Amino acid sequence: MNNFDYYRDFDDFQRRETINFFLAKFPFASKAQLDVFLEQAKTAYVKLRTSNPKNVDWNQMLVLLLKKFGPEARSEKERLKRILSLQEQLKVRLEGEINRQVQQNSELFSQLKQSESEIIQMQQLVEAKEHQIEALNKQLHAIKEANKKLIEEHESINVEELLKEYEVQCNEAIYKRDQHIQTVFEDKLALKDGEISETQSLLKTAEKEKQALKKAYKLVVNSLQKHQKLTTEIEIDFTKLDEIIATIFDETKNPKTGFTNFIKQFEKTKAKLTKKIAEITKLDHSTPTNYQQETPASQQQLDQENEPIKPSKKSNSSSLPRGTTQPKSNSINRVSKLID
């Protein structure tokens, strides 16, 4: 930092402290004396910051400056005289100020009285103006009433014509609106009629398809019933054939006679089976292909087909071929009755 920075630092931070310190010691010093002391203090502050002596602070420097300054050598008596003279001057100044304030107050009081008289005059003028305004308001009200009557008379002349014109406009607007509503309604009605006709045609077609499905269903059911009946009969015939074959090997009967009977019964059964197979084929061809349905065999039929034929008590199972079971005696009689 240079000397300029130290001077600026003194003005920023140490100037106020130096002034307070000086006035505390010399409260009645003049401004010139204060300026001289400030210059000496600023120079001493710059030297102190430049040399930076040890164990020396700014307060000690101010004390040293005061010892060298002239006003401190002044006697206490002179200081008291100075104080008394200043008090006298202040007293004279205060008395003059008091007299001036008293005179000023008397002038203000007289002005206030004059202002009160002026205010009274202004109030009187305001009242007069209010009376004038009231009279003008009455005239204005009368003029408004007259204008209102004139306007009503003028309007009453054209009211009927305006009403007629407005009525014509309303009638035209209503007619246009009715025409628009009727057009929209007719368009929507025609659209709905077309939709209803289409729906009715669809319902008729669906009803026809429903009747056709019912007829086809009945045909299928009848065909299935006949098919099941013929299948059952064929199964019975096959069972009878098994029983007839079993009788051939029965030791209690004549094999030759049994074989002859077997040939006869086999021919009869073959003819019946051929006839039934032809009927089944005819039923299969007569069933509609679009509604053909395969009916699975019932559990009872499966049980009957898978049930093994138990050997008769009168027969000997050892005389039968390998893999052949002995048929029931009552089954043979039942088959004979069916063949006859």
UniProtKB/Swiss-Prot annotation:
Domain of life: Bacteria
Comp. bias (Polar residues): 286-303, 320-334
Disordered: region residues: 284-340
Identification of the protein by name: Uncharacterized protein MG269
